[in-house]
Amino acid sequence: MKIIADTNVFIAVALNEPEKVKIIRITEGHDLIAPDVLPFEIGNALTAMMKKNALKKEEVASAWEIVQEIPVDLRHTNIKSALGIAIKFNLYAYDAYFLECAENLRSPLLTIDLGMQRVAREIGITIWE
């Protein structure tokens, strides 16, 4: 099955967050898909964590290397459609890119973000749990 994976899923795995084991278990044997903005959002998230002193500088590079080992199919982002979702639900565009991808591909969404889960359910996207 194809699963749309949110940025926080990749970050959780790379940083050995408590959700890592469950994420690996429920995605094993499935194809991960994400919008083509994923690498940029991961880079932004890692440096934001560094700026907040949640990650050391050297941890940013090592987390990026771990993320690069996770197979993911990057798909074109329909920004216009995603902006419509962002405006309708008062979201950041980055969150809407993943919702648009899941909606467009009719695939379930895997995210740790409870707000995204709520919006996904509201627009008829299945949450992969």
Spans of features found by a protein language model:
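Acidic, PIN/NYN-like endoribonuclease modules and their adjacent C-terminal/linker elements
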Residues: 2, 35, 99-129
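Active-site-proximal, substrate-binding regions of enzyme catalytic domains
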Residues: 43-70, 77-79
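Short, well-structured N-terminal submotif of metal-dependent ribonuclease cores
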Residues: 1-37, 49-61
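Active-site neighborhoods of divalent-metal-dependent phosphate/nucleic-acid chemistry enzymes
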Residues: 69-115
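Residues that scaffold the ATP/ADP-binding catalytic core of kinase and kinase-like folds
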Residues: 12-14, 45, 119
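Structured helix-beta-strand junction loops
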Residues: 29-30, 70, 105, 123
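Helix N-cap/coil-helix junction residues
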Residues: 54-55, 91, 125
